[in-house]
Curated annotation (Swiss-Prot):
PROSITE patterns: KRAB, SCAN_BOX, ZINC_FINGER_C2H2_1, ZINC_FINGER_C2H2_2. The gene is ZNF394. This is Zinc finger protein 394. Its main location: nucleus. PANTHER family: C2H2-TYPE DOMAIN-CONTAINING PROTEIN-RELATED, KRUEPPEL-LIKE TRANSCRIPTION FACTOR. Residues 265-274 have a biased composition (Polar residues). The modification Phosphoserine is found at S12. Keywords: DNA-binding, Isopeptide bond, Metal-binding, Nucleus, Phosphoprotein, Repeat, Transcription, Transcription regulation, Ubl conjugation, Zinc, Zinc-finger. The lineage of its organism: Eukaryota, Metazoa, Chordata, Craniata, Vertebrata. May be involved in transcriptional regulation. Residues 64-146 form the SCAN box domain.
Length: 574
Protein backbone atom coordinates (compact mmCIF):
# COMPACT_ATOMS: atom_id res chain seq x y z
CA UNK A 1 0.00 0.00 0.00
CA UNK A 2 1.65 3.17 -1.19
CA UNK A 3 1.17 6.65 0.17
CA UNK A 4 1.40 9.67 -2.07
CA UNK A 5 0.92 13.41 -1.88
CA UNK A 6 -2.17 14.31 -3.87
CA UNK A 7 -4.23 17.40 -4.40
CA UNK A 8 -7.73 16.13 -5.01
CA UNK A 9 -11.11 17.82 -5.41
CA UNK A 10 -13.88 15.87 -3.78
CA UNK A 11 -17.05 16.77 -5.58
CA UNK A 12 -17.97 19.87 -7.49
CA UNK A 13 -18.27 23.32 -5.96
CA UNK A 14 -22.03 23.03 -6.13
CA UNK A 15 -21.87 19.79 -4.14
CA UNK A 16 -19.62 21.21 -1.45
CA UNK A 17 -21.87 24.17 -0.73
CA UNK A 18 -21.05 27.83 -0.06
CA UNK A 19 -19.85 27.25 3.50
CA UNK A 20 -17.07 24.79 2.56
CA UNK A 21 -16.22 26.67 -0.65
CA UNK A 22 -15.62 29.87 1.32
CA UNK A 23 -13.41 28.13 3.88
CA UNK A 24 -11.35 26.37 1.22
CA UNK A 25 -10.91 29.40 -1.03
CA UNK A 26 -9.74 31.62 1.83
CA UNK A 27 -7.25 29.09 3.19
CA UNK A 28 -5.92 28.21 -0.26
CA UNK A 29 -5.47 31.84 -1.26
CA UNK A 30 -3.62 32.72 1.94
CA UNK A 31 -1.40 29.66 1.60
CA UNK A 32 -0.50 30.50 -1.99
CA UNK A 33 0.31 34.08 -0.95
CA UNK A 34 2.85 32.69 1.52
CA UNK A 35 4.32 30.40 -1.14
CA UNK A 36 2.85 27.21 0.36
CA UNK A 37 0.89 24.75 -1.76
CA UNK A 38 -1.86 23.04 0.26
CA UNK A 39 -1.67 19.26 -0.12
CA UNK A 40 -3.43 16.38 1.56
CA UNK A 41 -1.82 13.05 2.47
CA UNK A 42 -4.00 10.17 1.41
CA UNK A 43 -3.55 6.46 0.96
CA UNK A 44 -4.17 5.08 -2.53
CA UNK A 45 -6.31 2.36 -1.07
CA UNK A 46 -9.58 1.21 -2.60
CA UNK A 47 -10.96 0.81 0.89
CA UNK A 48 -10.33 4.40 1.98
CA UNK A 49 -13.47 6.10 3.26
CA UNK A 50 -15.31 8.35 0.83
CA UNK A 51 -18.38 10.45 1.70
CA UNK A 52 -21.56 8.83 0.45
CA UNK A 53 -23.81 11.04 -1.65
CA UNK A 54 -22.19 14.37 -0.66
CA UNK A 55 -24.68 16.25 -2.84
CA UNK A 56 -27.50 15.10 -0.55
CA UNK A 57 -25.75 16.21 2.61
CA UNK A 58 -27.25 19.20 4.43
CA UNK A 59 -25.13 22.21 5.24
CA UNK A 60 -22.70 21.86 8.21
CA UNK A 61 -24.85 23.97 10.56
CA UNK A 62 -27.86 21.70 9.99
CA UNK A 63 -25.68 18.63 10.54
CA UNK A 64 -24.36 20.16 13.77
CA UNK A 65 -27.90 20.69 15.04
CA UNK A 66 -28.84 17.11 14.13
CA UNK A 67 -25.72 15.86 15.92
CA UNK A 68 -26.45 17.83 19.10
CA UNK A 69 -30.21 17.18 19.14
CA UNK A 70 -30.19 13.43 18.48
CA UNK A 71 -32.03 11.62 21.28
CA UNK A 72 -31.67 8.02 22.33
CA UNK A 73 -35.44 7.55 22.05
CA UNK A 74 -35.27 8.34 18.31
CA UNK A 75 -33.09 5.31 17.43
CA UNK A 76 -33.57 1.55 17.69
CA UNK A 77 -30.69 0.81 20.03
CA UNK A 78 -27.22 1.78 21.28
CA UNK A 79 -25.48 0.51 18.12
CA UNK A 80 -27.64 2.65 15.85
CA UNK A 81 -27.26 5.63 18.17
CA UNK A 82 -23.46 5.42 18.03
CA UNK A 83 -23.51 4.95 14.25
CA UNK A 84 -25.84 7.91 13.75
CA UNK A 85 -23.69 10.13 15.94
CA UNK A 86 -20.56 9.22 14.00
CA UNK A 87 -22.22 9.92 10.67
CA UNK A 88 -23.73 13.24 11.81
CA UNK A 89 -20.40 14.33 13.32
CA UNK A 90 -18.61 13.51 10.05
CA UNK A 91 -21.18 15.50 8.07
CA UNK A 92 -20.71 18.43 10.43
CA UNK A 93 -16.91 18.51 10.75
CA UNK A 94 -16.14 16.95 7.31
CA UNK A 95 -12.65 15.59 8.09
CA UNK A 96 -12.12 14.66 4.44
CA UNK A 97 -12.32 18.36 3.50
CA UNK A 98 -11.12 20.35 6.52
CA UNK A 99 -7.78 20.29 8.28
CA UNK A 100 -7.34 19.52 11.96
CA UNK A 101 -6.92 23.21 12.76
CA UNK A 102 -10.16 24.06 10.96
CA UNK A 103 -12.03 21.32 12.82
CA UNK A 104 -10.64 22.55 16.14
CA UNK A 105 -11.72 26.08 15.21
CA UNK A 106 -15.27 24.83 14.57
CA UNK A 107 -15.38 23.12 17.97
CA UNK A 108 -14.01 26.17 19.76
CA UNK A 109 -16.46 28.43 17.90
CA UNK A 110 -19.40 26.24 18.89
CA UNK A 111 -18.39 26.24 22.55
CA UNK A 112 -17.85 30.00 22.45
CA UNK A 113 -21.37 30.53 21.11
CA UNK A 114 -22.73 28.13 23.73
CA UNK A 115 -21.27 30.01 26.70
CA UNK A 116 -22.49 33.39 25.46
CA UNK A 117 -25.44 34.91 27.33
CA UNK A 118 -28.76 33.98 25.76
CA UNK A 119 -29.49 37.53 24.64
CA UNK A 120 -26.20 37.57 22.72
CA UNK A 121 -26.40 34.03 21.34
CA UNK A 122 -29.36 34.61 19.03
CA UNK A 123 -27.90 37.85 17.66
CA UNK A 124 -24.46 36.35 17.02
CA UNK A 125 -25.80 33.13 15.46
CA UNK A 126 -27.92 35.24 13.09
CA UNK A 127 -24.68 36.63 11.64
CA UNK A 128 -23.30 33.08 11.12
CA UNK A 129 -19.66 33.73 12.11
CA UNK A 130 -17.22 31.34 10.46
CA UNK A 131 -14.36 31.77 12.94
CA UNK A 132 -13.78 32.70 16.54
CA UNK A 133 -12.40 36.10 15.55
CA UNK A 134 -15.56 36.89 13.59
CA UNK A 135 -17.73 35.89 16.55
CA UNK A 136 -15.70 38.10 18.90
CA UNK A 137 -15.98 41.03 16.51
CA UNK A 138 -19.76 40.57 16.25
CA UNK A 139 -20.09 40.48 20.05
CA UNK A 140 -17.98 43.62 20.39
CA UNK A 141 -20.09 45.40 17.79
CA UNK A 142 -23.26 44.45 19.66
CA UNK A 143 -21.82 45.59 22.98
CA UNK A 144 -20.92 48.94 21.46
CA UNK A 145 -24.46 49.27 20.12
CA UNK A 146 -26.00 48.40 23.50
CA UNK A 147 -23.75 50.90 25.26
CA UNK A 148 -24.93 53.61 22.88
CA UNK A 149 -21.48 54.36 21.49
CA UNK A 150 -21.38 56.17 18.18
CA UNK A 151 -20.54 54.06 15.12
CA UNK A 152 -18.64 56.92 13.52
CA UNK A 153 -15.12 56.14 12.39
CA UNK A 154 -16.06 52.58 11.47
CA UNK A 155 -15.33 50.68 8.27
CA UNK A 156 -16.89 47.49 6.96
CA UNK A 157 -15.02 44.97 4.83
CA UNK A 158 -16.38 41.90 3.07
CA UNK A 159 -14.11 39.29 4.56
CA UNK A 160 -15.62 39.59 8.03
CA UNK A 161 -18.85 41.52 7.41
CA UNK A 162 -18.57 43.19 10.82
CA UNK A 163 -17.69 46.69 11.96
CA UNK A 164 -14.13 47.64 12.94
CA UNK A 165 -12.57 50.89 13.96
CA UNK A 166 -9.95 52.44 11.71
CA UNK A 167 -7.32 51.55 14.32
CA UNK A 168 -8.37 47.89 14.27
CA UNK A 169 -8.39 47.88 10.46
CA UNK A 170 -4.86 49.34 10.37
CA UNK A 171 -3.60 46.75 12.87
CA UNK A 172 -4.64 43.90 10.56
CA UNK A 173 -1.96 41.98 8.71
CA UNK A 174 -1.32 43.79 5.37
CA UNK A 175 -1.53 40.47 3.55
CA UNK A 176 -4.99 39.90 5.01
CA UNK A 177 -6.17 43.37 4.00
CA UNK A 178 -4.83 42.94 0.46
CA UNK A 179 -6.42 39.53 0.24
CA UNK A 180 -9.81 40.93 1.29
CA UNK A 181 -9.72 43.56 -1.44
CA UNK A 182 -8.40 41.23 -4.13
CA UNK A 183 -10.94 38.53 -3.31
CA UNK A 184 -13.76 41.06 -3.44
CA UNK A 185 -12.62 42.35 -6.83
CA UNK A 186 -12.25 38.83 -8.23
CA UNK A 187 -15.74 37.88 -7.03
CA UNK A 188 -17.27 40.89 -8.71
CA UNK A 189 -15.30 40.53 -11.94
CA UNK A 190 -14.49 44.26 -12.01
CA UNK A 191 -11.74 46.54 -10.84
CA UNK A 192 -11.69 49.99 -9.34
CA UNK A 193 -9.49 52.84 -10.52
CA UNK A 194 -6.33 52.77 -8.35
CA UNK A 195 -6.51 56.51 -7.81
CA UNK A 196 -9.89 56.24 -6.12
CA UNK A 197 -8.97 53.16 -4.12
CA UNK A 198 -5.86 54.80 -2.68
CA UNK A 199 -7.85 57.88 -1.68
CA UNK A 200 -10.36 55.74 0.20
CA UNK A 201 -7.51 53.93 1.94
CA UNK A 202 -6.11 57.31 3.00
CA UNK A 203 -9.56 58.40 4.23
CA UNK A 204 -9.74 61.32 1.81
CA UNK A 205 -12.93 63.01 0.66
CA UNK A 206 -14.14 62.11 -2.83
CA UNK A 207 -16.97 64.09 -4.47
CA UNK A 208 -19.45 62.18 -6.62
CA UNK A 209 -18.45 64.14 -9.72
CA UNK A 210 -14.88 62.86 -9.49
CA UNK A 211 -16.08 59.30 -9.01
CA UNK A 212 -18.11 59.56 -12.20
CA UNK A 213 -15.19 61.11 -14.08
CA UNK A 214 -12.83 58.33 -12.98
CA UNK A 215 -15.22 55.52 -13.84
CA UNK A 216 -16.70 56.78 -17.13
CA UNK A 217 -13.46 56.81 -19.24
CA UNK A 218 -13.00 53.12 -18.52
CA UNK A 219 -16.43 52.32 -19.90
CA UNK A 220 -17.60 51.19 -16.47
CA UNK A 221 -20.39 53.68 -15.86
CA UNK A 222 -22.85 51.67 -17.90
CA UNK A 223 -21.75 48.54 -16.04
CA UNK A 224 -22.31 50.36 -12.78
CA UNK A 225 -25.88 51.19 -13.75
CA UNK A 226 -26.38 47.55 -14.69
CA UNK A 227 -25.16 46.45 -11.25
CA UNK A 228 -21.92 44.88 -12.58
CA UNK A 229 -19.42 47.30 -11.08
CA UNK A 230 -18.15 46.81 -7.50
CA UNK A 231 -18.95 50.44 -6.82
CA UNK A 232 -22.65 49.68 -7.07
CA UNK A 233 -25.06 46.89 -6.26
CA UNK A 234 -28.59 46.54 -7.51
CA UNK A 235 -31.58 45.52 -5.44
CA UNK A 236 -35.30 45.22 -5.96
CA UNK A 237 -36.44 46.97 -2.79
CA UNK A 238 -38.56 50.10 -2.71
CA UNK A 239 -37.56 53.33 -1.02
CA UNK A 240 -40.27 52.91 1.61
CA UNK A 241 -39.68 49.20 2.14
CA UNK A 242 -35.90 49.37 2.34
CA UNK A 243 -34.60 47.61 5.43
CA UNK A 244 -31.07 47.25 6.71
CA UNK A 245 -29.34 44.03 5.69
CA UNK A 246 -27.19 44.01 8.78
CA UNK A 247 -28.37 44.27 12.38
CA UNK A 248 -27.27 47.18 14.49
CA UNK A 249 -26.60 50.78 13.66
CA UNK A 250 -25.75 51.82 10.11
CA UNK A 251 -22.04 51.79 9.39
CA UNK A 252 -19.92 54.46 7.72
CA UNK A 253 -18.92 54.18 4.09
CA UNK A 254 -22.49 52.95 3.61
CA UNK A 255 -25.64 55.02 3.35
CA UNK A 256 -28.06 52.96 5.40
CA UNK A 257 -30.99 55.29 4.72
CA UNK A 258 -32.44 55.27 1.21
CA UNK A 259 -32.74 58.77 -0.18
CA UNK A 260 -35.44 60.02 -2.50
CA UNK A 261 -34.12 60.24 -6.06
CA UNK A 262 -35.68 63.61 -6.66
CA UNK A 263 -33.25 66.50 -6.14
CA UNK A 264 -30.33 64.25 -5.15
CA UNK A 265 -27.28 64.87 -7.33
CA UNK A 266 -24.24 63.93 -5.27
CA UNK A 267 -23.09 62.06 -2.23
CA UNK A 268 -22.64 65.39 -0.51
CA UNK A 269 -26.44 65.67 -0.32
CA UNK A 270 -26.34 63.33 2.66
CA UNK A 271 -25.16 64.67 5.97
CA UNK A 272 -23.64 62.81 8.88
CA UNK A 273 -27.03 61.82 10.23
CA UNK A 274 -27.97 60.14 6.98
CA UNK A 275 -30.48 62.82 5.98
CA UNK A 276 -30.57 64.88 2.77
CA UNK A 277 -29.40 68.46 2.95
CA UNK A 278 -30.60 71.41 0.87
CA UNK A 279 -29.33 72.76 -2.43
CA UNK A 280 -26.80 75.05 -0.73
CA UNK A 281 -24.91 72.08 0.71
CA UNK A 282 -24.54 70.11 -2.53
CA UNK A 283 -20.88 71.04 -2.83
CA UNK A 284 -20.02 69.87 0.69
CA UNK A 285 -18.03 66.66 0.71
CA UNK A 286 -19.14 63.75 2.82
CA UNK A 287 -17.03 62.72 5.79
CA UNK A 288 -15.88 59.09 5.57
CA UNK A 289 -17.40 58.41 8.95
CA UNK A 290 -20.87 59.42 7.78
CA UNK A 291 -23.57 56.87 7.08
CA UNK A 292 -23.19 56.58 3.32
CA UNK A 293 -24.67 53.52 1.61
CA UNK A 294 -27.90 52.65 -0.19
CA UNK A 295 -27.76 56.08 -1.84
CA UNK A 296 -30.15 56.13 -4.76
CA UNK A 297 -28.23 57.15 -7.87
CA UNK A 298 -31.10 56.96 -10.36
CA UNK A 299 -30.85 60.73 -10.82
CA UNK A 300 -27.55 60.25 -12.66
CA UNK A 301 -29.13 57.94 -15.27
CA UNK A 302 -30.56 59.60 -18.39
CA UNK A 303 -34.34 59.46 -18.33
CA UNK A 304 -34.41 57.43 -21.55
CA UNK A 305 -32.27 54.72 -19.91
CA UNK A 306 -34.11 54.58 -16.60
CA UNK A 307 -35.62 51.16 -15.93
CA UNK A 308 -39.03 52.58 -14.99
CA UNK A 309 -41.05 55.52 -16.16
CA UNK A 310 -43.81 57.67 -14.72
CA UNK A 311 -44.49 59.07 -11.28
CA UNK A 312 -43.74 55.82 -9.52
CA UNK A 313 -40.05 55.98 -10.42
CA UNK A 314 -39.11 58.18 -7.48
CA UNK A 315 -41.20 56.22 -4.99
CA UNK A 316 -41.03 52.62 -6.13
CA UNK A 317 -37.98 52.09 -8.30
CA UNK A 318 -37.43 48.42 -8.93
CA UNK A 319 -33.88 48.98 -10.18
CA UNK A 320 -32.53 51.52 -7.73
CA UNK A 321 -28.75 51.66 -7.34
CA UNK A 322 -27.00 51.82 -4.00
CA UNK A 323 -23.58 53.30 -3.38
CA UNK A 324 -21.13 50.92 -1.73
CA UNK A 325 -17.43 51.22 -0.90
CA UNK A 326 -15.48 49.13 -3.42
CA UNK A 327 -13.87 46.93 -0.83
CA UNK A 328 -17.33 46.27 0.64
CA UNK A 329 -18.95 44.30 -2.17
CA UNK A 330 -22.24 42.47 -2.26
CA UNK A 331 -21.55 39.56 -4.63
CA UNK A 332 -24.28 37.28 -3.28
CA UNK A 333 -27.79 37.84 -4.58
CA UNK A 334 -31.02 36.31 -3.38
CA UNK A 335 -34.07 35.50 -5.47
CA UNK A 336 -35.73 38.68 -4.20
CA UNK A 337 -32.93 40.77 -5.72
CA UNK A 338 -31.30 41.80 -2.43
CA UNK A 339 -27.51 41.71 -2.26
CA UNK A 340 -25.43 40.66 0.71
CA UNK A 341 -21.83 41.30 1.80
CA UNK A 342 -21.15 37.73 2.83
CA UNK A 343 -22.23 34.26 1.79
CA UNK A 344 -23.48 33.57 5.32
CA UNK A 345 -25.95 36.46 5.03
CA UNK A 346 -27.11 35.08 1.69
CA UNK A 347 -27.58 31.67 3.29
CA UNK A 348 -29.61 33.25 6.10
CA UNK A 349 -31.80 35.02 3.54
CA UNK A 350 -32.31 31.74 1.69
CA UNK A 351 -33.38 29.97 4.87
CA UNK A 352 -35.81 32.75 5.74
CA UNK A 353 -37.60 32.41 2.40
CA UNK A 354 -37.48 28.64 1.98
CA UNK A 355 -40.60 26.62 2.62
CA UNK A 356 -41.49 24.91 5.89
CA UNK A 357 -42.45 21.38 4.88
CA UNK A 358 -43.11 19.96 8.36
CA UNK A 359 -46.57 20.94 9.59
CA UNK A 360 -48.18 20.24 12.95
CA UNK A 361 -51.49 18.44 12.52
CA UNK A 362 -52.92 19.89 15.74
CA UNK A 363 -52.33 23.63 15.42
CA UNK A 364 -51.11 24.01 11.82
CA UNK A 365 -47.76 25.54 12.73
CA UNK A 366 -44.98 24.75 10.21
CA UNK A 367 -41.28 24.08 10.70
CA UNK A 368 -38.20 23.80 8.50
CA UNK A 369 -36.78 20.74 10.24
CA UNK A 370 -38.40 17.52 11.40
CA UNK A 371 -36.63 17.71 14.76
CA UNK A 372 -38.28 21.07 15.48
CA UNK A 373 -41.68 19.54 14.73
CA UNK A 374 -40.99 16.63 17.10
CA UNK A 375 -40.11 19.01 19.92
CA UNK A 376 -43.18 21.14 19.22
CA UNK A 377 -45.54 18.14 19.28
CA UNK A 378 -44.59 17.43 22.87
CA UNK A 379 -46.63 20.50 23.78
CA UNK A 380 -49.77 18.80 22.48
CA UNK A 381 -49.01 15.27 23.67
CA UNK A 382 -47.66 16.29 27.05
CA UNK A 383 -44.67 13.99 26.54
CA UNK A 384 -41.80 14.60 28.95
CA UNK A 385 -38.96 12.22 28.07
CA UNK A 386 -36.30 13.88 30.23
CA UNK A 387 -36.58 12.86 33.88
CA UNK A 388 -34.65 14.03 36.91
CA UNK A 389 -32.89 11.18 38.72
CA UNK A 390 -33.12 13.02 42.05
CA UNK A 391 -36.81 13.87 42.36
CA UNK A 392 -38.40 12.17 39.36
CA UNK A 393 -39.74 15.36 37.81
CA UNK A 394 -39.95 15.18 34.01
CA UNK A 395 -39.44 17.78 31.30
CA UNK A 396 -40.14 18.04 27.59
CA UNK A 397 -36.80 19.69 26.77
CA UNK A 398 -33.31 18.65 27.81
CA UNK A 399 -32.40 22.29 28.45
CA UNK A 400 -35.20 22.55 31.02
CA UNK A 401 -33.87 19.44 32.77
CA UNK A 402 -30.38 20.94 32.89
CA UNK A 403 -31.71 24.09 34.55
CA UNK A 404 -33.76 22.04 37.02
CA UNK A 405 -30.81 19.86 38.06
CA UNK A 406 -29.01 22.95 39.28
CA UNK A 407 -31.52 23.13 42.14
CA UNK A 408 -30.11 19.81 43.40
CA UNK A 409 -26.43 20.41 42.66
CA UNK A 410 -26.43 24.03 43.80
CA UNK A 411 -24.57 25.04 40.64
CA UNK A 412 -24.78 28.73 39.81
CA UNK A 413 -22.85 29.28 36.57
CA UNK A 414 -24.00 32.84 35.87
CA UNK A 415 -22.09 35.58 37.71
CA UNK A 416 -22.84 39.28 37.93
CA UNK A 417 -19.68 41.13 36.93
CA UNK A 418 -20.58 44.15 39.06
CA UNK A 419 -21.33 42.61 42.45
CA UNK A 420 -20.20 38.99 42.06
CA UNK A 421 -23.58 37.45 42.91
CA UNK A 422 -24.22 34.11 41.19
CA UNK A 423 -27.39 32.69 39.67
CA UNK A 424 -28.65 29.36 38.37
CA UNK A 425 -30.34 30.74 35.26
CA UNK A 426 -29.33 33.40 32.79
CA UNK A 427 -32.77 35.01 33.02
CA UNK A 428 -32.28 35.50 36.76
CA UNK A 429 -28.95 37.20 36.08
CA UNK A 430 -30.55 39.51 33.51
CA UNK A 431 -33.27 40.46 35.97
CA UNK A 432 -30.66 41.12 38.64
CA UNK A 433 -28.49 43.21 36.33
CA UNK A 434 -31.39 45.55 35.73
CA UNK A 435 -30.96 46.70 39.34
CA UNK A 436 -27.49 47.97 38.39
CA UNK A 437 -28.71 49.78 35.28
CA UNK A 438 -31.90 51.53 36.32
CA UNK A 439 -30.96 54.38 33.99
CA UNK A 440 -31.71 52.10 31.02
CA UNK A 441 -35.22 51.44 32.29
CA UNK A 442 -38.31 53.58 32.19
CA UNK A 443 -40.31 54.67 35.17
CA UNK A 444 -44.09 54.50 35.35
CA UNK A 445 -45.50 57.89 36.32
CA UNK A 446 -48.50 56.29 38.02
CA UNK A 447 -46.88 53.92 40.50
CA UNK A 448 -43.14 54.60 40.11
CA UNK A 449 -42.31 51.05 39.03
CA UNK A 450 -39.40 50.74 36.61
CA UNK A 451 -39.44 48.38 33.63
CA UNK A 452 -38.17 48.03 30.10
CA UNK A 453 -39.74 50.05 27.32
CA UNK A 454 -41.30 46.89 25.83
CA UNK A 455 -43.03 46.14 29.13
CA UNK A 456 -43.83 49.74 30.00
CA UNK A 457 -46.70 50.03 27.52
CA UNK A 458 -48.13 46.74 28.74
CA UNK A 459 -47.78 47.87 32.35
CA UNK A 460 -49.51 51.18 31.73
CA UNK A 461 -52.61 49.36 30.52
CA UNK A 462 -53.11 48.20 34.10
CA UNK A 463 -53.61 51.81 35.17
CA UNK A 464 -55.61 52.92 32.15
CA UNK A 465 -57.80 49.83 32.05
CA UNK A 466 -57.16 49.64 28.32
CA UNK A 467 -58.20 46.39 26.61
CA UNK A 468 -57.32 46.72 22.93
CA UNK A 469 -57.88 43.08 21.92
CA UNK A 470 -61.56 42.30 21.38
CA UNK A 471 -63.29 39.01 20.66
CA UNK A 472 -65.61 39.26 17.65
CA UNK A 473 -67.83 36.46 18.96
CA UNK A 474 -68.78 37.71 22.43
CA UNK A 475 -67.26 41.23 22.36
CA UNK A 476 -65.14 40.48 25.41
CA UNK A 477 -61.91 42.50 25.53
CA UNK A 478 -58.43 41.58 26.74
CA UNK A 479 -55.23 43.37 27.60
CA UNK A 480 -52.92 40.87 25.90
CA UNK A 481 -53.15 39.28 22.45
CA UNK A 482 -52.19 35.91 23.92
CA UNK A 483 -55.20 36.07 26.26
CA UNK A 484 -57.45 36.65 23.25
CA UNK A 485 -56.01 33.59 21.47
CA UNK A 486 -56.66 31.43 24.52
CA UNK A 487 -60.19 32.80 24.80
CA UNK A 488 -60.96 31.96 21.14
CA UNK A 489 -60.61 28.27 21.98
CA UNK A 490 -63.76 28.51 24.09
CA UNK A 491 -65.77 29.38 20.96
CA UNK A 492 -63.99 27.03 18.57
CA UNK A 493 -63.87 24.12 21.00
CA UNK A 494 -60.23 23.56 20.14
CA UNK A 495 -58.32 21.47 22.67
CA UNK A 496 -54.78 21.11 21.34
CA UNK A 497 -53.21 19.79 24.56
CA UNK A 498 -53.76 16.08 25.20
CA UNK A 499 -52.76 13.90 28.14
CA UNK A 500 -50.54 11.02 27.01
CA UNK A 501 -51.76 8.81 29.90
CA UNK A 502 -55.57 8.99 29.74
CA UNK A 503 -56.14 10.86 26.47
CA UNK A 504 -58.09 13.71 28.02
CA UNK A 505 -57.64 16.98 26.14
CA UNK A 506 -57.49 20.60 27.29
CA UNK A 507 -57.58 24.01 25.65
CA UNK A 508 -54.71 25.41 27.71
CA UNK A 509 -51.30 23.99 28.50
CA UNK A 510 -51.51 25.14 32.13
CA UNK A 511 -54.64 23.03 32.63
CA UNK A 512 -52.88 20.00 31.16
CA UNK A 513 -49.94 20.48 33.55
CA UNK A 514 -52.30 20.55 36.53
CA UNK A 515 -54.10 17.44 35.27
CA UNK A 516 -50.88 15.47 34.79
CA UNK A 517 -50.09 15.84 38.49
CA UNK A 518 -52.97 13.43 39.13
CA UNK A 519 -51.03 10.71 37.28
CA UNK A 520 -47.56 11.60 38.55
CA UNK A 521 -48.61 12.34 42.13
CA UNK A 522 -46.53 15.51 42.08
CA UNK A 523 -47.42 18.07 44.76
CA UNK A 524 -45.14 21.07 44.28
CA UNK A 525 -46.91 23.47 46.68
CA UNK A 526 -45.94 23.09 50.34
CA UNK A 527 -47.42 24.70 53.42
CA UNK A 528 -44.69 26.27 55.54
CA UNK A 529 -46.76 25.90 58.73
CA UNK A 530 -47.52 22.18 58.78
CA UNK A 531 -45.60 20.79 55.80
CA UNK A 532 -48.66 19.48 53.95
CA UNK A 533 -48.29 19.49 50.15
CA UNK A 534 -50.80 20.24 47.38
CA UNK A 535 -51.08 19.81 43.62
CA UNK A 536 -52.42 23.30 42.90
CA UNK A 537 -51.64 26.70 44.34
CA UNK A 538 -55.35 27.40 44.90
CA UNK A 539 -55.56 24.39 47.21
CA UNK A 540 -52.58 25.69 49.19
CA UNK A 541 -54.17 29.14 49.55
CA UNK A 542 -57.42 27.59 50.78
CA UNK A 543 -55.48 25.48 53.27
CA UNK A 544 -53.48 28.46 54.58
CA UNK A 545 -56.70 30.20 55.55
CA UNK A 546 -57.20 27.48 58.17
CA UNK A 547 -53.97 28.50 59.90
CA UNK A 548 -54.87 32.18 59.60
CA UNK A 549 -58.29 31.63 61.20
CA UNK A 550 -56.71 29.65 64.04
CA UNK A 551 -54.25 32.45 64.74
CA UNK A 552 -57.04 35.04 64.75
CA UNK A 553 -59.22 32.97 67.10
CA UNK A 554 -56.32 32.42 69.51
CA UNK A 555 -55.53 36.12 69.44
CA UNK A 556 -59.10 37.08 70.21
CA UNK A 557 -59.29 34.59 73.11
CA UNK A 558 -56.14 35.93 74.75
CA UNK A 559 -56.83 39.61 74.31
CA UNK A 560 -60.62 39.87 74.20
CA UNK A 561 -61.01 40.80 77.92
CA UNK A 562 -58.36 42.41 80.11
CA UNK A 563 -59.17 43.25 83.82
CA UNK A 564 -59.06 46.97 84.47
CA UNK A 565 -57.49 48.19 87.74
CA UNK A 566 -59.92 51.08 87.75
CA UNK A 567 -63.21 49.29 88.06
CA UNK A 568 -62.83 45.71 87.03
CA UNK A 569 -64.28 46.54 83.64
CA UNK A 570 -62.91 44.64 80.63
CA UNK A 571 -61.58 46.53 77.65
CA UNK A 572 -61.07 45.33 74.13
CA UNK A 573 -57.59 45.40 72.75
CA UNK A 574 -57.58 46.51 69.15
Amino acid sequence: MNSSLTVQRRGSDAELGPWVMAARSKDAALSQRDGVLPVKVEEDSPGSWEPSYPAAWPDPETSRLHFRQLRYQEVAGPEEALSRLRELCRRWLRPELLSKEQILELLVLEQFLTILPEELQAWVREHCPESGEEAVAVVRALQRALDGTSPQGMVTFEDMAVSLTWEEWERLDPARRDFCRESAQKDSGSTVPPSLESRVENKELIPMQQILEEVEPQGQLQEAFQGKHPLFSKCGSTHEDRVEKQSGNPLPLKLENSAEAEGLNSISDVNKNGSIEGEDSKNNELQNSARCSNLVLCQHIPKAERPTDGEEHGNKCKQSFHMVAWHVLKPHKSDSGDSFHHSSFFETQRQLHEERPYKCGNCGKSFKQRSDLFRHQRIHTGEKPYGCQECGKSFSQSAALTKHQRTHTGEKPYTCLKCGERFRQNSHLNRHQSTHSRDKHFKCEECGETCRISNLFRHQRLHKGERPYKCEECKKSFKQRSDLFKHHRIHTGEKPYGCSVCGKRFNQSATLIKHQRIHTGEKPYKCLECGERFRQSTHLIRHQRIHQNKMLSVGRGAHACNPSPLGGQGRRII
